[in-house]
Curated annotation (Swiss-Prot):
Keywords: Cell membrane, DNA-binding, Isomerase, Membrane, Topoisomerase. GO terms for cellular component: chromosome; cytoplasm; DNA topoisomerase type II (double strand cut, ATP-hydrolyzing) complex; plasma membrane. Heterotetramer composed of ParC and ParE. Topoisomerase IV is essential for chromosome segregation. It relaxes supercoiled DNA. Performs the decatenation events required during the replication of a circular DNA molecule. It comes from Mycoplasma pneumoniae (strain ATCC 29342 / M129 / Subtype 1). This is DNA topoisomerase 4 subunit A. The record marks K42, H78, H80, R91, K97 as: Interaction with DNA.
Amino acid sequence: MEKNKQALLLQAIEDVFAFSFSKYAKYIIQDRALPDLRDGLKPVQRRILYGMYQMGLKPTSPYKKSARAVGEIMGKYHPHGDASIYDAIVRMSQAWKNNLTTISIHGNNGSIDGDNAAAMRYTEARLSPYGFELLKDIEKQLVPFVNNFDDSEVEPSVLPTLLPNLFINGTSGIAAGYATNIAPHNVGELLDGLSYRIENPDCDLKAILKIVKGPDFPTGGLVYFEQELANIYQTGKGKFVIQAKYETNTAFGQNQIVITEIPYETVKANIVKQIEELISDNKLSALESVIDSSDRSGIRIIINHKDFLSADKIMAFLFKHTQLQVNFNLNNTVIANRCPVRVGLLAYFDQFLAFAHELIINSAKYDLALANKRLEIIKGLIKAVSMIDEIIRLIRRATDKQDAKTKLIDKYAFTLNQAEAIVSLRLYQLTNTDIKVLFAEQKELEQTIQTAERLIAKPQARNQLLQAQFFQYKKQFNQPRRAQIVGLIEKQKVQDSDFIEHKEVGLLISHDGIYFKFEPEQLAKHLVEFKSEQDQLIFGGVVQNSDYFFMVTSLGNIITVPIYKTLSNTKTKMNELLAKKPILMEDEKLVLAGIVNPDKMEQQLLVLTSQCGMVKRVELSKVINTKQIKSSCCMALRERDKLVNAFVQTKGEPKLVCLVSSSNSFATFLAEEIPIISNKGIGVKGIKLKAEEKVRFAMPLQDNDALVVINSDGGVYNFEVVELAVASRMSVGKKLIPKTKTPVSCFAANKHSEIIGHRGKNGSDLFTLNELNRLPKSTVSQMRLFKWS
């Protein structure tokens, strides 16, 4: 116990955390998330390739279960869970994620639609030809090997590849304090660029960029950049914009846009879903339908559209609102000399070529050592064959193998290796050896030694070998460029208003929040057909599809909605008007709906009246919000109060405002007496009310108007403005109709006004004021009446 106590280390907890996290962060940076500059691989990818190589899973070998490979790799090299290993194997096999796949999977390895791969127990895997090439000459020990996690195995610290894999397939990852996002490039362009750099070591970046034209994504697309390409590849950091490639078509009289290539790292099914949501939400009325007709031959997303917008404009809208356009933020952060650094294209080429020279030197040294050792033996065998009889007698007289070796060394001056080779041969092999074959092998070995020595000594020889190897790789792995480099992107401010169908539409809006948009010629028909015993219309008319309408609610809120974003030809509740965006609270009613007129809005005021008699005016331009569909306050209300009326007043008109209470009191006063205050103000008293008395109606009055009052038994009362007792604000209302009569409708009208009379289930009729006066009371009593125009 005392011994254990002495072994304890007392240390502050913050120091323990700091040390542990810094150690962990260093591990994450160096050995997990960032790729090595030389082979372009993260540790898990390198271990997968090496583990499968050790299992003999060559491109020509039979496939083996992925689960077996995962178990081997996890048990020997990467003890971080089977899921991470299998996910990496799957990604390394996906052609839409890599320009050249390093692993070949037999079975379901996922799809560009985001489908998961089959479980590892169902799929089979092996190295692809490209992946196998990354491991070429691994057995020569050309690179340092390190112990695995439990020191039971060794693994390469880097693969001895002469392929610029870092830029061929690209990669991405996030470490502690560092991130990387390297774009894939065309293998042929990279190999040509490396060859050009070898021939012209002093060339500048612009010369290389004539060969390496930019990223080449496996899914194709159009590539733009926001700054000069040279700046991006000089610093190793910048932004590319990738757009889908499309073509236009007409089939069976239907205008079509056909998407044939999508941006890198996007999911096709998600793109189709985004377009479907735009259609269902009526975000762009030109869109009609989308069909995914993709198959094994390639991507084919068909978008049917109306012809009032061009295909280019529709695609501009889709680029803004879907993943048909994405940004690729280039960040070439890699591990070089065990440190994270950001490299440009020239820096990468130079460091990769330096690594390639190192590999060639190590390979030449390895070949040289083997050739010298074999040449020593061949020379001994040639010497032995020339004195075959003496050698045979010596071996037969020897007491054992060691005695024979000693005598060969002492008597004939053979080296130890030569003597070992001679005594290891059976006598019949020794006697039957063809000296011509030995001389031919000697010559071949001497040439090998000469070549190896030249490669070790002369950089020019190594460069020639590299260029020949790059040429061979280009023949073996080159692919046509998929992504089209367009150039600098022109920043265009695309607004939703650019995509509106400019036409007239009919529009009806009711007190209960029923919204109906239809063809303008059907207005009269829908007015007559409007049926509701409890609801009533508050707006109707022919408007422009590009207009905005605003609504004032009983809770003192105002909402502005663009008409072009709403659905047509169906009666819709206001909370279903915009998908996933309720705009009215429960029991919230509409008291006013109108069209926003930007040219007149600065001269317009919104006059608001609550049932408790509060009135206020607010500048319309300060409460209208056309940038977003959002309910905002236009009048603060006390508890148990609600808005009963709102109307728009042009400054200076109308002159009078009339409030009608639940006890038939009519208070008329000048509109100028109502103060203009902020949207969150409560307002001022407009009429003196008795206990339990409420304001039921409020309306503006012009000089030539008549105040029309309809009571419950169908009586119609018309009062000229001069008959009203105009008083000051906050006065007691005047009794204009008998106390026994209950007003059910009240509005200002003139001889040109039209009145709508709702007849319940029988529909609605339009009347002039004079016609209404001539109707029998029994007919009027069955109607809910209000002014139409």
